[in-house]
Every structure is written in structure tokens, then in C-alpha cells.
Amino acid sequence: MVKRTHGYRYKSRKLLSKAPRERGMSGLSRLLYEYKPGDKVVIDIDPTFISTAPHRRYQGKVGVVIGTRGRAYVIETYIGDKKKIIITTPEHLRPHLGG
């Protein structure tokens, strides 16, 4: 038998797809929201923008904005005890409303 591949988007069919009524561009408020260093954000992957999307393991994670790189934001989050740095655009972020 041939070994099955495990690519970057492996096991993400439901996660990285939109329902028919959600297709198309997101609202402008999500794209134009300005984050400042120290703001808490939720990583919420938008499947419309594939090239700037973080890996699916970060979906739903809460992180802290530590800076910018061009239009993108540098986010610090944790996977278990490990600190991870993610660089992604505002399409994949939303403000964290919790405490």
C-alpha cells in the first residue's frame, strides 16, 4: 500500500470551509479593526484567505499582540507549556471579549 500524505491542511475539511450563506468576504469592521500591543485576540481562521492563515492547531486560541510586521500582526500564544509566535493578518483575528 501507498503511505497516505499528511499535508498542511490535513483533517481540516469542516474547519476550513464556509457554509453556503457565509461565503464571500467578511465584514469590513473585522478587517479595519486596529490592534495595539498588549491586546488579547482570538485566532479565528477565515478560509477565504489561505496564504496568510495560521495552522489549524491555533484555531480558537487566545493570544496577545506583541507587534506588527507590515499589515500583519505578531501574536504570542501557548500550546501546552510552549510559547509560540504566530504572524498573521487581521482577517484571522478578532478581539477577545473575555476577562
Swiss-Prot record:
One of its GO terms (cellular component) is ribosome. One of its GO terms (biological process) is translation. It comes from the Archaea. Keywords: Ribonucleoprotein, Ribosomal protein. The keyword Ribosomal protein applies. GO terms for molecular function: structural constituent of ribosome. PANTHER family: 60S RIBOSOMAL PROTEIN L21 (PTHR20981). HAMAP family: Ribosomal_eL21. This is Large ribosomal subunit protein eL21.
